[in-house]
Amino acid sequence: MADEIKKRINCVFVAGGAWHDIDFARLEILKILSEDERIRTRVFEDYDTAATALDEADFLVTYTCNVTCSVSTQEKLQAFVAGGKRWYALHGTNSILRFLTPKDTQYGELLIEAPRSQPLFMETLGSQFIAHPPVAPFRVEVTQPNHPLVEGVEAFETTDELYLLETHGVLDVILHCDYGGDAKGFVEGKWEQQQHPVFYIHEVDKGQVLYLTLGHCRGHYDMPEFTDYYPTVERCAWDLPVYYTLLRRGLEWAKIPALERISAEAQEDEVKA
């Protein structure tokens, strides 16, 4: 029935921020969205501007890093999800970073801090990025092998940023990794051995957020504060077919409420006719 629905589905996509190849991520996600011709996507670089389009949106997709928003926008994002919509949040969406120079710290070195300056935003997402160890290969485990979002997906290894999170509320974890050790360069850099969410669902009243922490990417020109030409192009999990499987399934998941609504409206129209 879902494939027979011909009505338009509206997506708001926020792609912007720092230290990542946003152009690459934006294009890859738009290509997947375009596989369903019913999806019409409006693209924004920040949440405050995107908030103006949320009233007409059926679902929200985000790939950002260090993009903050006003309290009113945080409230609107939470209300959007709480009202029954879905938000697919990728990689650095939950990241707010502040670089502390040696004179700002007691440690005598450059450190990265994760300020708790957007509490409602992070509560809606269900997590906030705090740190990651140096990029290196790690194993992603399937927490719920029978979950439809990871049906047929087996544990895999990726070279990516292993996100260490502060969580909010109850998370339905679908993929996780195991880690304990140092996240060098971060203020909160000491972590005990434990499981860390990689792919999870967070319920917000009638709606849900799906979060996937994987997906770091960086090109030659994405670190202008530090260098005019970054020597390495980093694609991390984007090099893996399984990552595109998770992207596609997440986007299919995100549009389910819209399809259910359109189907119900069509049935009502048939009854009236």
Regions found by a protein language model. Name each.
Residues 25, 29, 73, 117, ...:
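Stable alpha-helical elements in mature extracytoplasmic
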Residues 68-152:
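A glycine-rich, often tryptophan-bearing local segment used as a flexible ligand/cofactor-contacting loop or short
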Residues 38, 85, 114-115, 207-208, ...:
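Residue-level recognition of short, well-ordered coil/turn positions
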Residues 2-9, 35, 189-198, 204-273:
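Extracellular ligand-binding/catalytic regions of CAZymes and related secreted enzymes
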Residues 18-19, 67, 94-96, 178-181, ...:
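Short, solvent-exposed loop/turn segments at secondary-structure junctions
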Residues 24-26, 99-103, 186-187, 222-225:
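Short aromatic-enriched loop/helix-cap "lid" or pocket-rim segments at secondary-structure transitions
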Residues 10-99:
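Helical hinge/lid and interdomain linker segments adjacent to catalytic or ligand-binding clefts
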